[in-house]
Amino acid sequence: MFIESFKVESPNVKYTENEIHSVYDYETTEVVHEKTVNGTYQWIVKPKTVKYDFKTDIRVPKLGVMLVGLGGNNGSTLTAGVIANKEGISWATKDKVQQANYFGSLTQASSIRVGSFNGEEIYAPFKSLLPMVNPDDVVFGGWDISDMNLADAMARARVLDIDLQKQLRPYMENIVPLPGIFDPDFIAANQGSRANHVIKGTKKEQVDHIIKDMREFKEKNKVDKVVVLWTANTERYSNEVVGMNDTMEDLMESVDRDEAEISPSTLYAIACVLEGIPFINGSPQHTFVPGLIDMAIRNNVLIGGDDFKSGQTKMKSVLGDFLVGAGIKPTSIVSYNHLGNNDGMNLSAPQTFRSKEISKSNVVDDMVASNGILFEPGEHPDHVVVIKYVPYVADSKRAMDEYTSEIFMGGKNTIVMHNTCEDSLLAAPIILDLVLLAELSTRIQFKSEGEGKFHSFHPVATILSYLTKAPLVPPGTPVINALSKQRAMLENIMRACVGLAPENNMIMEFK
């Protein structure tokens, strides 16, 4: 059974006009290596319970979202999709009359289990857990190095059906991105022809320009909060250099000196941190150099990334987890992609492809490390990623994967998968989820037993991991890539905010 909404009744939950307060017992384990009476060591696992207080502000703000790369395939597709949903637009395809929807969005189109009733499982919308911004109410803006209006950008992208594009054109032809930061050293040379709409000046002047743009956007649109997300070209990997970008002070001094190695994406992120605005990196480049992470932590400003997890990598994070969890040993993973959109064109340059290769290649690391029966220390499956540019297929990316595994008694198992990933139609709802969850997380505060004051989540937002290929985590935090664990983490944190136990799937009431 599916219900649209619910309210929790519990002595551990209190609803006020502006907040939800919950008291939550977090049950976990502590693992220690102890010396026994005979002088040997053994591993001891000790269950423990930590009491947490959560406080969630339920006043939903008017949200503005500024996209870096607003005129790209993702930016134009997302903006078009939100307008179509808000206006209730329908259009004819070769199969049927299609209604606008938010399919592919975790927050808008997925469900969570809330319990059982008369022997039947009860589910509710994911978005019913906590008050969230309605995507129809989001105000979009942003930057692009191309001055093309969003109606023409939508046509250039070749993602949406023509009938839909015709209906959306009046809403989009007057939306023109702000000029963007362009540095030809960081992206493929083939992008130069699009760069007719750029911010001039030194890196310091560019940061100041972005800050001015964000302030004016917020004032003009009368929004309460702004979230900025990078959905522009993948940059080449930025080098970490001691004395240049390893601390906040060094990074800011490097900006003042106009150091060449400070990338455009890092400049946008710096501007956001200085303004207290959340910044999310949707591409695989090394935006978050150590100095920027240091800066975000010291200023307590949310940052998240890296790289949207939409197609091939999402499947890999499921299949890899399944194989290792089933006691099957993956020994070779070969991934081949070809696509024909501007992302593929930019990735045809070796230096930008390297960023994507790094992002895609680490996705099974935590799964391999979890099973010392299958893998010796340091052992890892052979893992190869290939991406080729084929203009004809446009945004309809093809992903082909071959998984070779060792099974019982020396046997071999091979799984081959072909995945047609409509690139921007998969990425757009993920962008939506990222900005909505980033905003929501800024309204949640908590404290553990013994702490005097409530505080926000760590600025490095692991809560967004489900949506990213290479999750950014705080220093010293394990990276979790298994998709089921990432979703469980996100859902269970939100459940804790309303005093609900984590979904453990034991269903003891039916045993």
From Swiss-Prot:
CC cofactor: NAD(+)
Highest taxon above the source species: Eukaryota
GO biological process terms, alphabetically, are: inositol biosynthetic process; phospholipid biosynthetic process
Q: Name one GO cellular component term.
A: cytosol
For molecular function, the Gene Ontology terms on record are: inositol-3-phosphate synthase activity
The function of this protein is: Key enzyme in myo-inositol biosynthesis pathway that catalyzes the conversion of glucose 6-phosphate to 1-myo-inositol 1-phosphate in a NAD-dependent manner.
Q: What name has this protein been given in UniProt?
A: Inositol-3-phosphate synthase
